[in-house]
Amino acid sequence: MSKVSVLVVDDASFIRDLVKKCLRNYFPGIKIEDAVNGRKAQAILARETFDLVLCDWEMPEMCGLELLTWCREQDHLRTLPFIMVTSRGDKENVVQAIQAGVSGYVSKPFTNEQLVTKVKHALNKAGKLET
């Protein structure tokens, strides 16, 4: 399996740690960076390349939807797989995220299997994983 790189964006450190542990267990050798909000993620995405972004919706400074919208406006990030990992699972929020160009949606709380399935699907679709 080729090495993949993921940016995990969430203001809750325990969620970032949970996501990173889950991904490291399933994808040995994965490169993971993290950010505490959309603004920090924006700075990281401006200087580094990733295969996938996993992002919370509700965060201080810049929310996940704002980060997603910004990514879709950048030529080099327009097709970057972007999965929302959020407690905002109601229909209006899901539709809003889809309209903004989200690649996938994982509702909190989630199981490791749910997260890994969404990540694998997004990476396969983008041609970043060997099937």
Predicted segments with their positions:
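Receiver (REC) domain active-site loop signature in two-component systems and cognate sites
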Residues: M59
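Two-component/phosphorelay signaling modules centered on CheY-like receiver
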Residues: S13-E33
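Short amphipathic alpha-helix used as the core "switch/output" element in two-component signaling
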Residues: A43, L65-R78
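Helix N-cap/capping motif at the beta->alpha junctions
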Residues: D34-A43, G64
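C-terminal output helix
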Residues: F110-V119
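Active-site beta3 strand of CheY-like receiver
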Residues: E48-L54
